Curated annotation (Swiss-Prot):
Protein's name in the database: DNA-directed RNA polymerase subunit beta
A single GO cellular-component term on record: DNA-directed RNA polymerase complex
Gene3D superfamilies per UniProt: 2.40.50.100, 2.40.50.150, 3.30.60.280, 3.90.1100.10, DNA-directed RNA polymerase, beta subunit, external 1 domain (2.30.150.10), DNA-directed RNA polymerase, subunit 2, domain 6 (2.40.270.10), RNA polymerase alpha subunit dimerisation domain (3.90.1800.10), RNA polymerase Rpb2, domain 2 (3.90.1110.10)
Keyword Phosphoprotein on entry: no
CDD domains per record: RNA_pol_B_RPB2
Length: 1432
């Protein structure tokens, strides 16, 4: 699907040479997919997989009480109320039908036009949706408050979670203790409201939009690393949940185990606890054992693989006397095979051949019962002679030195004093719980629970898969659902660790993306939910044990879901990964949702993260953007997903590649609908074969539908293959042209012949993130500047008039669509009406066979008008379609902030000259033409929200009113009779926005006040002014007021007026929907009766007046005017017998739909009139929105897309700006010295190409790493009649003279960033002081002062400005007495300064007193005796 055609923007001239057939996956799919898998909200209980919520419930339930007489079991859960508009159809089963082929249940989709696929058998079925016979609507999720209402009312956008729980009560036989079921009760328990994700991948929590950032953490599994200082190796088994185990050895070759980073103990203790009780069992588990026999005082070795590598003292001969291995010759692998071939079973060995051998088991003299040699003891020649003498016939040996595992296990067993399993368990308990007296039961319980209890230990499917890949080299070696460990797992781990000493195997790179995985929203929430459920489980168990009579208990008596909901609330409200959405512009929203953070619970911390974790790793290629990351302490810890990357079911990031076979790129497609071809759904077929199959069908049969296919590989899968870059030259048949190509192999760049290449990149874009892919000529910019460029695009403020860039990258359309900023059409149809606030699309439904189409009526799109974003920027949508236009599904109907005809537009195209101008653009400063200010190029609207609430106080209720004591009428001129400012009023700092009075406590009145009170009445005195005033720095227009009143409170006039306008809007929507339905009715009747002739006159039933005469031909206009009862009475030529039925059906369906629409509108109106749910104690809440127009001004920060940022130093009159030979003045002058040292040459190329684009009247797309070449830029400049150098003569606007050198001129896309001088400028006269130090507070938010620091004091000291210094350091700082005196002096007109004691001196005294030093201040100086001076 070509996305370009779905916006209204003109198509761009594309410079890319590599055409990518794979569309970019939906950019916010990461969030949506993860949360869908977690909730499984639209699935029936029997359709749900064991993931997300389902798996959490299954893992915590069933819950049994301590006595074992009752169980609580989880049955299923449901989220939200699924019903039609009128509530007649209830339940998700109405969105299901049965497959005609296999009889399985399949999901139907009311918004899908075509057939639907059965996932069991791959057959396509008719999409038969059950519609309600009253309202004509299918079942859908019905919510109490929609997203907009939640944002306005400060509520959470959520749906109710109901869980069906079964309580089983048993009775125990007192004698046999047998349990029998006494009672079973099942009940649906309301758990609470679970937040829902909006269509844009965000959550609305307490009225604000939040994003849950995905976390990048260490994957569970088994890891081996080298300890650099000591040079030995370390093995770790890291579970998803549970205890960590570490295995290590020291330079004495002793194996140690450490559990949960506690004290270490011998590895043999751990192995005994696992069930390898004796030394022999441990040795057999790790070493290769060979069997020896003694016959006729000679030693024979039973032939096995242990012989390889040995030199034998005796030659080996066959029965026929042929020598296979000569005396003293080493037995190689090939010689060993010959031994086997010759079927030699035993070979003679001399005692010295067994040097270094140890015995596996105790060797016992059968006659005396004496142990001749202990297990794990070395077999010396002396011992050998003893064994021969004692008549021992056989024993088993192993060679620790020669074995892959080495001497570690044997050495550890010798060192270890613990010899039995019970001792081992108690020893482990002592190490883990020092101080607790161990008993065998508690020790066994602790050890068993640590690794073998699924409730306490979860290795997870991911952990098991990583374990299999590492130790067995294939992901399915053991079952992935085996989520606890067993002794074999530990043995395999220890064996691998010990083999590493011999150089067998490889250590792991912890920063490899095969060892780091992404925890997205769903998984993070699943963990929170589990924490809550475990807390709830404890409470339930306690309740069950104290409940008197379980037979009368119901599940809801035992289940209290508060801890679960508290855990979820805490996660959304205060988790480090739940963040206030960055909503500056659509790009910042998308980037925030695609962000990956290594911080957060269970992750790293800024302080501990080293350089390696932050660095770019070869596996980031195509998965994580190497460019986009914040500057500062979080660099490298917070990153962004690449354009094409996706996250697989295990949480690993995958990147797409196309297959290469024998040097040719395979163009594959995936079958979506086989039609009449022989393929099945999901088959991967070569494009040529598919085209051929479709061609063979001819025009009559249904052709197959397909989409481009590529293979997604994870980081460790990718390491196995050789992968070429996307820009490898291919011929027209897709064959690689050069014999040697650049390729990647296991993270290294290599040159490979084309036959060895196995995959090729999908697109050059796949390396970078969305923000970086929007930078044209990214390949010509230094990486540091590209980083700044991609970060600064996210700070661009939405401008009053958006303007798409002349030089884009082709990603603008995709980004704008997926961000949710633009309005997309849900169903194909025709635009019925358009105004600034809404768009109505008349839906054209396709009728099914013999059925009337249900898909009639209209889609009404309410546009967002001047809404405040999280960052106080303005969200405003403007329609870009016209009435009568046909719009396909997915077309852009309206532009949002920062979009222009469906394309992302963060800034404006401006004419730029690179030249110095009188020092005003020194050091990155920017010189701007006044034209940009006059023509509102960079004017933006910012909306501030202020709220005030009237509460119930102890002294009486607060009141929102116009009647404020001691306030002049001029201050109240803009307030209405309710005390709330009118919309459209212009306000400045200090103006009253909402008048409010608060009752104040009774005070003792003076006689004069009593007299005044008696004359002027009681009211004025007992209330004080608590109005909402406009704060400093805010100057603008009131654009909206929202008033929320508590239920049952009398509404004021303003509330009623607002309510009335909302009701009118609802009724207007209703009228439009009814109009469309009646039009549709007339249209359908028209198609039924159009062109039919009357056989007789038609008279009115009541008046008998002739309505139509005989032989009249019916037209649509006539039919529309007539009533249905008259239509039914007409006698028509060749009238269809079912005609009257069809007329009835159309009429009935229309009237039913109208009735339901009216009912829904009435409900909405009733909800409006009912009053609002407010926090306790709040009577009324008023929100006032002020829109401020921010024009471009000196001090604003501007930037290009290449990291070229600067601050406006001067706004110059248009006539003074340098101008082109044709008299056009330039709009911005930048300093050319900002380019060479920064190495962001991309901006110069953009300047040239932008100039050509403006002159040719086209827009260009130059995708990253595949953009316009220098030759192409020159070609376009020539076509536009511009100099190919990109330079031209410029003239000084002030003098009219020509500048000496030609100057680079062209169009650059410049952004205004959200660092506006109006938000930063700040001044203080008198303001708040810190309570303890009595020094002024700092910062604009606190209305603070400017710090006069140590160095500034030195400067004044250098000038000897003593009085200024004294005033700064005392009266203007913390001399409380002094500042009061200065105020007095100013009032009296005196100029004296009387200093007091600075408060910091008092603070110092208090500090010393707190250290128990008795410091007293003397009033008078003490007389110093002469003797003391003499002594000095």
């Amino acid at each position: 699907m070509d996305l370009q055609n779905y916006g209204a923007a003109p198509e761009r001239v594309d410079f890319s040479k590599i055409k990518t057939s794979i569309p970019i996956p939906n950019l916010i799919e990461v969030q949506k997919k993860s949360y869908e898998r977690f909730l499984q909200m639209d699935l029936l209980p029997n359709e749900r997989e064991d993931i997300g919520l389902q798996t959490v419930f299954n893992s915590v339930f069933p819950i049994s009480d301590f006595r074992g007489v009752s169980d609580l079991e989880f049955v299923d859960y449901s989220i939200g109320n699924w019903e039609c508009k009128c509530g007649n159809l209830k339940g998700l089963h109405h969105l299901r039908s049965t497959c005609r082929n296999c009889g399985a249940t399949i999901r139907t989709d009311p918004f899908h036009a075509g057939d639907i696929l059965c996932h069991h058998c791959g057959t396509f079925n008719k999409n038969v949706v059950t519609f309600c016979n009253k309202c004509g609507d299918p079942v859908g999720l019905q919510l109490k408050y929609d997203m907009q209402e939640c944002q306005e009312r400060g509520m959470t956008y959520a749906a109710p979670l109901k869980v069906t729980i079964r309580l089983t009560v048993y009775s125990k036989d007192p004698e046999t203790q047998k349990k029998s079921v006494r009672d079973i009760k099942e009940q649906e328990v309301f758990f609470g409201e679970i937040p829902l994700m909006t269509d844009n991948g965000t959550f609305i929590i307490n009225g604000t939009e939040r994003v849950i950032v995905s976390q990048l953490h260490r994957s569970p599994g088994v890891f081996f690393e080298r300890v650099p200082a000591q040079g030995y190796f370390l093995g770790k088994i890291i579970p998803y949940r549970g205890s960590w185990v570490e295995f290590e050895y020291d330079n004495k070759n002793i194996l140690y185990v450490r559990i949960d980073r506690k004290r270490k103990f011998y590895g043999s203790v751990f192995l005994r606890a696992l069930g390898l009780k004796t030394d022999e069992q441990i040795l057999r588990a790790f070493y290769r054992v060979s069997k020896m026999e003694i016959r006729d005082k000679k030693i024979y070795w039973n032939v096995d693989e242990g012989l390889t590598g040995l030199k034998l003292s005796h030659a080996i001969t066959t029965k026929s006397g042929d020598t296979v291995v000569g005396q003293g010759k080493k037995i190689t692998a090939s010689l060993f095979k010959e031994l086997q071939k010759a079927k030699i079973e035993k070979v003679e060995v001399a005692p010295n051949d067994l040097e270094g051998a140890h015995v596996v088991a105790d060797v016992v003299d059968m006659t005396t019962g004496e142990v001749m040699i202990d297990a794990n003891s070395e077999l010396t020649t002396t011992v050998m002679s003893k064994l021969i003498e004692a008549g021992i016939t056989e024993f088993e040996i192993f060679f620790p030195e020669r074995d892959d595992v080495g001497t570690v296990i044997a050495a550890t067993i010798r060192k270890d004093a613990v010899k039995t399993q019970n001792e081992a368990l108690i020893e482990i308990y002592r190490k883990l719980r020092p101080g607790d007296p161990p008993t065998l039961d508690t020790a066994t319980q602790l050890f068993q629970g640590m690794f073998f209890d699924p409730r306490k230990y979860d290795f997870s499917r991911v952990g098991r898969m990583k374990f299999n890949i590492k130790l067995y080299d294939r992901s399915d070696a053991t079952a992935l659902d085996k989520r606890t460990l067993d002794s074999d797992d530990f043995k395999s781990t220890i064996r691998y660790l010990l083999k590493l000493r011999k150089g067998i195997g490889a250590v792991d790179d912890i920063d490899h993306l095969g060892n780091r995985r992404v925890r997205a929203v769903g998984e993070l929430l699943e963990n929170q939910f589990r924490i809550g459920l475990v807390r709830m489980e404890r409470a339930i168990k306690e309740k069950m044990s104290v409940y008197q009579e379980m037979s009368t208990a119901m599940p809801h008596d035992l289940v209290n879901a508060k801890p679960v909901m508290a855990a979820i609330r805490e996660f959304f409200g205060s988790s480090q990964l739940s963040q206030f959405m960055d909503q500056t512009n659509p790009l910042s929203e998308i980037t925030h949702k695609r962000r990956l953070s290594a911080l957060g619970p269970g992750g790293l911390s800024r302080e501990r993260a080293g350089f390696e974790v932050r660095d770019v790793h070869p596996t980031h290629y195509g998965r994580i953007c190497p460019i986009e990351t914040p500057e500062g302490p979080n660099i490298g810890l917070i990153s962004s997903l690449s354009c094409f990357a996706r996250i697989n079911e295990y949480g690993f990031i995958e990147s797409p590649y196309r297959k290469v076979i024998k040097g040719a790129v395979v163009d594959e497609v995936k079958v979506l609908n086989p039609g009449d071809t022989d393929y099945k759904v999901g088959d991967i077929v070569r494009r040529g074969d598919m085209d051929e199959a479709n061609r063979k069908l001819g025009g009559k049969k249904q052709a197959a539908e397909f989409e481009a296919h590529c293979e997604y590989l994870s980081a460790w899968e990718e390491d196995k293959w050789t992968i070429a870059q996307a820009n490898v030259e291919l011929d027209e048949k897709g064959r690689i042209v050069p014999d040697l190509s650049n390729a990647r192999q296991a993270g290294n760049f290599v040159l490979k012949p084309k036959e060895e290449i196995e995959y090729i990149d999908v697109s050059p874009k796949q390396l970078v993130s969305v923000a970086a892919s929007l930078i044209p000529f990214l390949e010509n910019d230094d990486a540091n500047r590209a980083l700044m460029g991609s970060n600064m695009q996210r700070q661009a403020v939405p401008l009053l008039r958006a303007d798409a860039p002349y030089v884009g990258t082709g990603m603008e359309m995709v980004t704008a669509r997926d961000s949710g900023a633009v309005v997309l059409n849900k169903r194909a149809g025709v635009v019925d009406s358009v105004d600034s606030e809404r768009i109505i699309v008349r839906v054209e439904g396709a009728a099914h066979e013999g059925q009337l189409s249900r898909e009639v009526g209209a889609d009404i799109y309410q546009l967002t008008k001047f809404k405040r974003s999280n960052q106080n920027t303005c969200i405003n949508q403007k329609p870009i379609v016209r009435v009568g236009q046909r719009v396909p599904k997915g077309a852009v109907l309206a532009d949002g902030p920062c979009t222009d005809l469906g394309e992302l537009a963060l800034g404006r195209n401006v004419l730029v000259a690179f030249m110095p101008w009188r020092g005003y653009n020194f050091e990155d400063a920017i010189l701007v033409s006044e034209k940009l200010v006059k023509e509102d190029y960079y004017t933006s609207i910012h909306i501030e929200e202020f709220e005030i609430e009237a509460r119930d106080t102890k002294l009486g209720p607060e009141e929102i009113t116009r009647d404020i004591p001691n306030i002049a009428d001029s201050f109240l001129r803009n307030l209405d009779e309710s005390g709330i400012i009118r919309i459209g009023a212009t306000v400045k700092p200090g103006d009253i926005l909402v008048g409010k009075v608060t009752p104040k406590g009774e005070t003792q009145l003076t006689p004069e006040e009593k007299l005044l009170r008696a004359i002027f009445g009681e009211k004025a005195g007992d209330v004080k002014d608590a109005s909402l005033y406009c704060p400093p720095g805010i100057e603008g227009t009131i654009v909206d007021c929202k008033i929320f009143s508590r239920k049952g409170q009398e509404k004021d006039e303003r509330s009623k007026a607002i309510e009335e306008s909302q009701i009118q809007r609802l009724q207007r929507n209703l009228q439009d929907e009814i109009r469309i339905l009646t039009d549709e009715r007339a249209k359908r009747l028209g198609t039924l009766l159009d062109g039919k002739k009357l056989l007789a006159d038609l008279h009115d039933e009541k008046t008998n007046k002739r309505l139509l005469s005989k032989d009249t031909e019916l037209t649509r206009e006539l039919i529309e005017k007539m009533k249905s009862r008259d239509l039914k009475r007409m006698r028509l030529a060749n009238k269809d017998p079912r005609l009257n039925e069809q007329i009835d059906e159309i009429e009935e369906m229309t009237s039913r739909q109208i009735a339901v629409l009216e009912k829904i509108t009435d409900e909405k109106i009733a909800k409006l009139r009912k009053g609002d749910e407010l926090p306790p104690g709040v009577i009324k809440l008023v929100k006032v929105y002020i829109a401020m127009k921010r024009k471009l001004s000196v001090g604003d920060k501007m930037a290009g897309r290449h990291g070229n940022k600067g601050v406006i130093a001067r706004i110059l009159p248009e006539e003074d700006m340098p101008y082109l030979p044709d008299g056009t003045p330039v709009e911005i002058v930048l300093n050319p010295l900002g380019v060479p040292s920064r190495m962001n040459v991309g901006q110069i190329l953009e300047t040239h190409l932008g100039w050509a684009a403006k002159a040719l009247g086209v827009q260009f797309a130059t995708p990253v790493f595949d953009g316009a070449t220098e030759r192409e830029i020159k070609k376009n400049l020539t076509a536009a009649g511009l100099p190919t150098s990109g330079k031209t003569a410029l003239f000084d606007g002030m003098t009219g003279t020509q500048f000496e050198q030609p100057v680079t001129v062209g169009y650059i896309y410049m952004l205004k960033l959200s660092h506006l001088v109006d938000d930063k400028i700040h001044a203080r006269s008198i303001g708040p002081y810190s309570l303890i130090t009595q020094q002024p507070l700092g910062g604009k938010a606190q209305f603070g002062g400017q710090r006069f620091g140590e160095m500034e004091v030195w400067a004044l000291e250098a000038y000897g400005a003593a009085y200024i210094l004294q005033e700064l350091l005392t009266a203007k700082s913390d001399d409380v007495y002094g500042r009061a005196k200065i105020y007095e002096a100013i009032v009296k007109g005196e100029a004296a300064i009387e200093p007091g004691v600075p408060e910091s001196f008092n603070v110092l005294i208090r500090e010393l007193q707190s250290l128990c030093l008795d410091v007293e201040l003397m009033k008078k100086p003490r007389e110093v005796p002469d003797t003391a001076l003499a002594a000095d």
